């Protein structure tokens, strides 16, 4: 019994452990300060981009996401069509077919992984924060003709966000959520189900 009283709760090395924890806490605080400085500089640079305010009008697309997309995309003037950027991001559609076999159409995943990441983050954020993107996501996943899985819907929305960003940067137009909702095909009076 006396051995147990002496062995439990040894205090050897507690001072060294305390010093190590203090050092790690200081490192975390220093890194947080550096991150804040970098984000501040990033936000300033983002505001210098022409038409950035128009793009930031999209709910869910913030300065961090926009900076990530534009950094990976590069100069917009080198692209003649938005499909070139879609292909650069690896979101171009490819069909897996051979001979008489026709496989499913999937995104290629060939291209800039980080651009694809930022576009997907923009899609997730827009679906969470913007009503028009929520409606689109719901429409794509619940439509009667060819409903998409949730991930497929997010990829389609990411491509749509890319097209919106491309159009704003090329033409200088403002973001209009009503144009976005034109994809939703609502049943007309002749297509509406008859109530029995």
Q: Positions of the model-derived regions?
A:
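A detector of single, family-specific signature residues
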Residues: 1-196
């Amino acid at each position: 019994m006396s051995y147990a009283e002496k062995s439990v709760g040894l205090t050897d090395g507690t001072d060294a452990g305390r010093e190590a924890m203090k050092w790690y806490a200081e490192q975390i605080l220093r890194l947080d300060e550096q991150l804040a400085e970098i984000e501040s500089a990033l936000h300033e640079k983002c505001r210098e981009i022409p038409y950035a305010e128009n793009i930031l009008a999209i709910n869910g697309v913030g300065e961090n996401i926009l900076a990530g997309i534009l950094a990976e995309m590069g100069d917009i003037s080198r692209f003649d069509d938005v499909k070139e950027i879609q292909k650069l991001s690896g979101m171009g559609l490819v069909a897996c077919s051979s001979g008489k076999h026709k496989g499913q159409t999937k995104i290629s995943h060939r291209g800039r992984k980080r651009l694809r990441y930022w576009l997907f983050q923009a899609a997730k954020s827009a679906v969470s924060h913007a009503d028009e993107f929520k409606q689109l996501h719901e429409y794509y996943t619940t439509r009667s003709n060819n409903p998409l899985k949730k991930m497929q819907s997010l990829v389609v929305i990411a491509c749509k966000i890319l097209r919106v960003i491309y159009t704003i940067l090329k033409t200088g137009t403002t973001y209009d959520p009503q144009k976005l909702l034109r994809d939703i095909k609502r049943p007309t009076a002749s297509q509406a189900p008859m109530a029995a």
